[in-house]
């Protein structure tokens, strides 16, 4: 459950990014990490907006991409669990959509990656 002292940023993407950074994770915006993966890190990506049923609400979708170095695949599951446990603190602002991609080896950064999906429900303006 979200802490009543939570410091809101200007956007929900910034909230997610800063929360993870303040938790001690190495966090990047998409396409900003340069070089090979040497230690676990996260990339926070905005995945677009979808309408919420027939209500005057929408869902902003976000991916939290979890990376571990090529030779540390065995640490991927624990890293994902830790990230999900941390993000549970942001409910109901962000809800896990129960979507988690299979692991993917990203040769461009020499890392294994799994994406976990989160949603932010909001009233249309």
How should these model regions be labeled?
Residues 35-39, 106-109:
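Beta-rich nucleic-acid/ligand-interaction surfaces
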């Amino acid at each position: 459950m979200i802490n009543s002292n939570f410091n809101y940023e200007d956007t929900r993407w910034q909230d997610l990014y800063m929360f993870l950074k303040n938790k001690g994770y190495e966090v990047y915006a998409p396409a900003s990490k340069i070089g090979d993966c040497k230690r676990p890190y996260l990339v926070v990506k905005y995945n677009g907006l979808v309408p919420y049923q027939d209500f005057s609400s929408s869902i902003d979708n976000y991916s939290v991409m979890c990376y571990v170095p090529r030779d540390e695949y065995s640490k991927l599951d624990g890293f994902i669990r830790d990230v999900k446990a941390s993000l549970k603190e942001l409910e109901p602002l962000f809800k896990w959509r129960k979507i988690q991609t299979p692991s993917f080896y990203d040769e461009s950064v020499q890392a294994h990656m799994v994406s976990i999906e989160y949603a932010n429900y909001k009233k249309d303006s």
